[in-house]
């Protein structure tokens, strides 16, 4: 049956991910088998399952911040005022000529300073990102302690991962993913699924 195949597929996903991981997937066909497997069969209660299709909804962001089963919440740091009835689309203007550290980019969005806002021309100020290039420092000790990287591979690790978004806007779910990456500090493995 379809349910058996879906449950078996989700069981494979969840048995192959590292302890205390976050599994990020993109739609109901990926998510519901994982939820079923976890909630009904009790498989991997330490893993947090996150569906990016729902990350545009404030109720889901709030839910992801809280503990579920044995899994801690997702390390989102932006306050509700930055994702409730706002920031559905965030423009990117390349006005800074260097990659921004991801925490710096999220702090820019978090700021209420008018200098960190874009004026739409009618006096309405909106959040924006001042660059589409980002730097994500690698906490090597945490990456090893969490099992993301083996100790034997420490010398192969880079100090910083550079990201470039090939577009002029991000949506709310992408903003939240950047917030998570900026603040997870390599303490939890992050896995992505794709069908």
Where are these regions (language model features)?
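ER/secretory pathway lumenal C-terminal domains and tails of membrane proteins involved
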Residues: 1, 7-20, 37-195
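Phosphate- and divalent-cation-binding pockets in alpha/beta enzyme and binding domains
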Residues: 32-36
């Amino acid at each position: 049956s379809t349910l058996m195949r879906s449950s078996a597929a989700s069981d494979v996903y969840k048995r192959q991910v590292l302890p205390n991981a976050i599994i990020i997937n993109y739609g109901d066909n990926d998510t519901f088998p994982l939820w079923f497997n976890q909630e009904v069969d009790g498989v991997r209660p330490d893993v947090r399952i996150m569906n990016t299709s729902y990350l545009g909804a404030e109720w889901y962001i709030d839910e992801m911040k809280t503990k579920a089963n044995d899994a801690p919440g997702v390390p989102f740091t932006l306050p509700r005022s930055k994702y409730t009835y706002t920031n559905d689309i965030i423009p990117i203007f390349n006005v800074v000529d260097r990659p921004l550290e991801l925490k710096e980019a999220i702090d820019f969005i978090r700021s209420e300073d008018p200098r960190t806002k874009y004026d739409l021309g009618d006096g309405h100020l909106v959040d924006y990102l001042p660059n589409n290039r980002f730097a994500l420092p690698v906490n090597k000790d945490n990456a090893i302690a969490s099992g993301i990287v083996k100790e034997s591979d420490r010398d192969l690790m880079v100090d910083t991962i550079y990201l470039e978004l090939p577009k002029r806007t991000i949506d709310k779910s992408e903003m939240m993913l950047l917030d998570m990456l900026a603040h997870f500090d390599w303490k939890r493995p992050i896995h992505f699924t794709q069908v």
